[in-house]
UniProtKB/Swiss-Prot annotation:
This is Phosphoprotein. One of its GO terms (cellular component) is host cell cytoplasm. It comes from Rabies virus (strain SAD B19). Non catalytic polymerase cofactor and regulatory protein that plays a role in viral transcription and replication. Stabilizes the RNA polymerase L to the N-RNA template and binds the soluble protein N, preventing it from encapsidating non-genomic RNA. Also inhibits host IFN-alpha and IFN-beta signaling by binding and retaining phosphorylated STAT1 in the cytoplasm or by inhibiting the DNA binding of STAT1 in the nucleus. Might be involved, through interaction with host dynein, in intracellular microtubule-dependent virus transport of incoming virus from the synapse toward the cell body. GO terms for molecular function: RNA-directed RNA polymerase activity.
Length: 297
């Protein structure tokens, strides 16, 4: 009976991706709670109710439409200040995120790349937030800050429309940061901090960790070498690989990396045995050819 062995480095890379996704979901949930902070204020005093609530009054019951006025006022009050649990946007959004997480796990088990899955998921989450959490229209300050204690009027605590707009955009910003900056805005600073790029590099290296690549030997022969012979931690290999020109951009785009060039680069910097066995002049030409071929695709 055959057994399937999973490389520990691949597991670590996958766990790092899942932790990054969980942190993004937590950040989005916190922003949703901030956006709904104005729904959790203190009870509004009767003397400071909105103008449309003035229709609720006591009389002798002779008015034929007294019941209708009361029902209209009561219904509008419930619409403004109460929300059913089934209609709570945060409750529905939590269920949506749970389904998204299950879908991500299924896609990763089927062999799809995490960077591709996450970029698609981010777009779906942004669309969901934009549709289900639109910015509320601006209201007058009298409708939001009519709370008093004794004779003193409390200070305005409800965020302005511009503040609410910036808060609602935090979810989009968090999701965009987690998936990496757009290709047109790619810069060296982003390359150093983009965890999704490191995860993609680690994933591709882990897949070919034991594969042997051909290098020119000093003895006019062929030198076979692989990542295992480096005797290095996968995280250290990834950090060194990011210094190879063009590798971070390829990883960001989800393209295939020139792994032979990456291996040669890392081995020249960290393996004395490799330095003694390889023909450095021919190696430089091979590495440059690999880079040109992969970056031009």
């Amino acid at each position: 009976m055959s057994k399937i062995f999973v490389n520990p480095s691949a597991i670590r890379a996958g766990l790092a991706d899942l932790e990054m996704a969980e942190e993004t979901v937590d950040l989005i949930n916190r922003n949703i709670e901030d956006n709904q902070a104005h729904l959790q204020g203190e009870p509004i005093e009767v003397d400071n109710l909105p103008e449309d609530m003035g229709r609720l009054h006591l009389d002798d019951g002779k008015s034929p439409n007294h019941g209708e006025i009361a029902k209209v006022g009561e219904g509008k009050y419930r619409e403004d200040f109460q929300m059913d649990e089934g209609e709570d946007p945060s409750f529905l959004f939590q269920s949506y995120l749970e389904n998204v997480g299950v879908q991500i796990v299924r896609q990763m088990r089927s062999g799809e790349r995490f960077l591709k899955i996450w970029s698609q998921t981010v777009e779906e989450i942004i669309s969901y937030v934009a549709v289900n959490f639109p910015n509320p229209p601006g209201k007058s300050s009298e409708d939001k800050s009519t709370q008093t204690t004794g004779r003193e009027l409390k200070k305005e605590t409800t965020p302005t429309p511009s503040q609410r707009e910036s808060q609602s955009s935090k979810a989009r910003m968090a999701a965009q940061i987690a998936s990496g900056p757009p290709a047109l805005e790619w810069s060296a600073t982003n390359e150093e901090d983009d965890l999704s790029v490191e995860a993609e590099i680690a994933h591709q290296i882990a897949e070919s960790f034991s594969k042997k690549y051909k290098f020119p030997s000093r003895s006019s022969g062929i030198l076979l070498y692989n990542f295992e012979q480096l005797k290095m931690n996968l995280d250290d290999i990834v950090k060194e690989a990011k210094n190879v020109p063009g590798v971070t951009r390829l990883a960001h785009d989800g393209s295939k990396l020139p792994l032979r060039c990456v291996l040669g680069w890392v081995a020249l910097a960290n393996s004395k045995k490799f330095q003694l066995l390889v023909e450095s002049d021919k190696l430089s030409k091979i590495m440059q050819d690999d880079l040109n071929r992969y970056t031009s695709c």
